[in-house]
A protein has these predicted regions:
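Non-catalytic beta-strand/loop surface segments
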Residues: 1-42, 57-99, 120, 129-186, ...
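Active-site SXXK
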Residues: 45-57
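Short alpha-helical scaffolding segments that buttress acidic/His motifs in well-ordered protein cores
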Residues: 51, 101, 105, 109, ...
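Charge-rich, low-aromatic oligomerization/scaffolding segments with amphipathic character
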Residues: 100-104, 200-202, 325
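A common structural junction motif
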Residues: 107-114, 206-215, 330-339
């Protein structure tokens, strides 16, 4: 059944998207903000990540304890996350509590307190998370891969930030980040659940409509300009020795595409056929099932405002690192030489089309889907057009997508774990 959500834009630039779903007496609220780690100051990596952790820890009129008690008393939830280009406040509640929880979400978005004590506590928590990642081969392989792939491009910076950057952040940095990024023109409020769509629009207008946009925005949504990333011209292998670990992790890949790229759907079908879901696909069938070399292996297409990475990840024993990399090389070389089979593409398209309803089974999932649709300007009928877009993909288009991105001679390969790269010949 088509979603057919209601979309309006308030006079101050806030976008409101509502979708009624009366199957259960519950509501999901998602407040998307077009800002994130990409906007971190150069010497304050982690500002968006720390802001997300502190944002719901008190507002001008509510303490952190008062917020927690209010949510607990209603059986509701509220959380804040930060990505590279977007932050989001996500809340769930019963229908009867919608007005109160939406009011809380608006208060968190508009009037965070940024208490010094909360900042200190959340800073230490975030640093602990980063330290834990530094002890994880998977995280370290990805970090090394991204740094080598992007060099001095902004995408080389970690979304979570660095210990040094986070330690340097002070209250005024968070206040400045919030004032600059949390403008009504950057806000999208999505409500999905047991509410009438007109009532949602009225409620959001009441709580967000008096928020004055910054001078110069004129109610126009902010654009996100990301420079092109230079694709590596030769292959590079990076090793992160972690000799106390039992498993090595491999990150292998290339500079990918923007979400706005006309080849996005073809790339998605290609990625699925190659091995998006770990079990199945060329990579999984060969490296994991037939050869039994990998604990996991999958491919990933991360297309956003800029050219995110196209990556292949694998977890292996140290003894199988070189064999696994060689197998990935061989699989990509074979793909570039012979292409996919018609069966592979048909099965991938069938799976992708069949998974659309499953991806929209919950209010929260629908809200997240609609936020993506709004963020990238895909159109409120995208759920209706998507099956046709996927169905129109052909073997030739998937093969062309592979040839455009995948070249083992230009791959960046990073390995973290109990393994040392062999000395150059």
């Amino acid at each position: 059944m088509p979603l057919n959500p209601r979309r309006i834009v308030l006079d101050n630039g806030v976008t409101v998207i509502a979708k009624s779903n009366h199957t259960t007496p519950a509501v999901s609220i998602l407040v998307g903000v077009t800002t994130g780690a990409y906007s971190d100051p150069p010497d304050r990596d982690g500002t968006a990540a720390l802001c997300a952790r502190v944002l719901d820890r008190g507002t001008v009129t509510r303490s952190a304890d008062a917020i927690a008690d209010d949510l607990d008393g209603r059986g509701a939830s509220l959380s804040v996350v930060a990505g590279r280009h977007q932050m989001a406040i996500a809340a769930t509640c019963l229908t009867d509590d919608f007005d109160a929880v939406l009011s809380l979400a608006a208060d968190v978005a508009r009037h965070p307190r940024f208490d010094d004590d909360e900042i200190a506590t959340r800073r230490e928590s975030l640093i602990t998370t980063i330290r834990q990642e530094e002890d994880d081969p998977g995280s370290m392989a990805v970090d090394a891969f991204i740094r080598a792939l992007y060099g001095d491009h902004p995408y080389s910076r970690k979304v979570r930030g660095t210990v040094a950057g986070i330690e340097a952040i002070r209250r005024q940095d968070l206040v400045r980040f919030h004032q600059k990024g949390f403008d009504p023109t950057a806000i999208t409020v999505i409500v999905v659940g047991d509410m009438e769509e007109e009532a949602v629009s009225a409620a959001v207008s009441k709580l967000f409509g008096d928020w004055a946009p910054s001078a110069g925005t004129a109610g126009v949504k902010p654009g996100v300009a990301v420079p092109d990333a230079s694709a590596p011209v030769q292959r590079r292998l990076v090793s992160v020795p972690m000799m106390n670990k039992s498993q090595a992790d491999v990150a292998y890949g290339f500079v990918g595409i923007r979400r706005s790229d006309p080849d996005y759907t073809a790339m998605s079908v290609m990625n699925n056929a190659l091995g998006q879901y770990a079990i199945g696909g060329r990579l999984g069938d060969n490296i994991r099932e037939r050869q039994g070399m990998a604990y996991y292996v999958f491919s990933s297409l991360d297309a956003t405002f800029g050219q995110g990475p196209f990556s292949i990840r694998a977890g292996v024993s140290a003894a199988n690192v070189e064999k696994t990399i060689a197998s990935i090389d061989a699989e990509l070389t074979s793909l570039l030489d012979k292409g996919f089979t018609e069966q592979e593409i048909d099965e991938s398209k069938s799976y992708m089309i069949g998974s659309i309803p499953r991806q929209l089974e919950t209010n929260a999932a629908i809200a997240a889907f609609l936020l993506t649709v709004e963020t990238f300007g895909l159109g409120m009928d995208y759920d209706q057009r998507l099956p046709g877009l996927i169905g129109a993909m052909t073997r030739d288009k998937a093969d062309a997508a592979a040839r455009r991105l995948l070249d083992p001679a230009r791959a960046i390969v990073a390995v973290a774990g109990p393994w040392n790269a062999p000395a150059p010949a």
